[in-house]
Amino acid sequence: MYTLGIETSCDETAAAVLRDATVLSNIVSSQTKIHEKYGGVVPELASREHLKNLLPVVREALAQASVGVKQLDLVAATHAPGLIGALLVGVSAAKAIAFSGKIPFIGVHHGEAHILAAQIEHPDIGYPYIALLVSGGHTALYHVQEFGSYRMLGQTRDDAAGEAYDKVAKLLDLPYPGGPVIDRLAQEGSSSAIALPRGMQEGFDFSFSGLKTAVRTHVALFRSKDAGLDPKLNRKDVSASFQAAVVDTLVEKTVHAAKETGTKTIVIAGGVAANSSLRKRMREAAEKHGIRLVLPSMQYCIDNAAMVALTGYLHHKRGERSRLDLNPRPSMAL
């Protein structure tokens, strides 16, 4: 069967076509350049860009897959959580395609799509596994017991990890998005140059606000109202020290969750899963503890529609479908 997936939860306009669980096309149009000058995603601009780009992206996905609208057996779209205006664009388009072609429609939870994304390239993952969902809007640990059964073990109490990266990048006068920039600078810095805290060491919840405050306090020593940021501040060392603190926390809690639940497989999902230090450290920790680590390739870490199509396809196989009066929701627990 052919599934069209649509993703517009934040600032990526994406469409993909799958034949069963095989990706035939996966198109992503990023808005990063548009939001860069504002230091973050502007919801109104994001919605307008989705309106402008979605149909061309859908057409490209269908053309690349050599699939016509009349051949589609299912349309799936992210309906929660995310920016409400952005979600509305994708959900409305998906429902229109479904209604006009009398095609089943399924609304997909963005978080569920992320924690299933690794199955695109690794269909043999099996269950159960521990999923670390880590991105600009989410940081949470799930015990994925089987498809459709996800037990949250812990989540962030304040900033998501990706959000903390963006805020620290702003403190250092670095461009948005901050994650890739800090990751790159960190490779040339010393991770032990600055003593930074590791938040909420007990349990499975996360906290990055204390870490962010510690970085702000350090950077403030090198900033003046008149001259701005002092060139003596070593941004590479700050980046490396900050990244080490984040990665230490993510790795330790994820491995602890696997050991606590007796789970032998870990999956990392979300945009921050593309971070080079996180991938390296998690590989080392997994090998040390005899745990299988499954890492999606970069194209399936970022927001994409292939993971949405896969999730919709799996729900459809269970006989599920959504009503056409389904509304997008800005927040929704998994």
How does the language model describe each region?
Residues 2-81, 110, 238:
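N-terminal beta-alpha supersecondary unit
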Residues 13-18, 131-133, 139-143:
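Short beta-strand scaffold segments in enzyme catalytic cores
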Residues 68, 184-266, 276-289, 316:
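A contiguous, well-structured pocket-lining segment that forms one wall/lid of small-molecule binding clefts
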Residues 103, 108-130, 311:
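Conserved phosphate-binding catalytic cores of ATP/NTP-utilizing and phosphoryl-transfer enzymes
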Residues 107-108, 283-307:
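Conserved phosphate-binding/catalytic loops in two-lobed NTP-binding clefts
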Residues 115-116, 296-334:
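Glycine-rich phosphate-binding/hydrolytic loop that grips phosphoryl groups
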Residues 123, 145-188, 212-213, 217-223:
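Glycine-rich phosphate-binding loop plus the immediately following alpha-helix
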